[in-house]
Amino acid sequence: MTREQDLGRRGEEIAAQHLIGRGYTLVERNWRCREGEIDLVMTHAGTTVLVEVKTRAGLGYGHPLEAVTRAKASRLRVLAGLWCQAHPDRRGPVRIDVVGVLWPRGGQPSVEVVRSAC
């Protein structure tokens, strides 16, 4: 596993714990299909929440949330539709949240959540 992959994995764990601490329930991690991957599938207040997590160790490449471009947001919407097709038993509202984790080396991670980001 590369340093970037390890940072991403740890960022997903930080994001999951942050959301669980705010009343979300974890349903699934790293759901994959031929079109891509959804980092976290959670529920919150009767809504299925599909979560994209972006983690950075610094701001050299911009804030983690800046990594979700229009193209990425469009792809997340496609993935959301595919997830819903694959889980017809999950009825009700669905939204896509984006979580940015900024975790400087030697520092504490900071977490920012954008609800209904896409």
From Swiss-Prot:
It holds the Pfam family UPF0102. GO terms for molecular function: nucleic acid binding. It comes from the Bacteria. InterPro entries: Restrct_endonuc-II-like, tRNA_endonuc-like_dom_sf, UPF0102_YraN-like. Transmembrane segments: none annotated. Belongs to the UPF0102 family. This is UPF0102 protein CMM_1377.
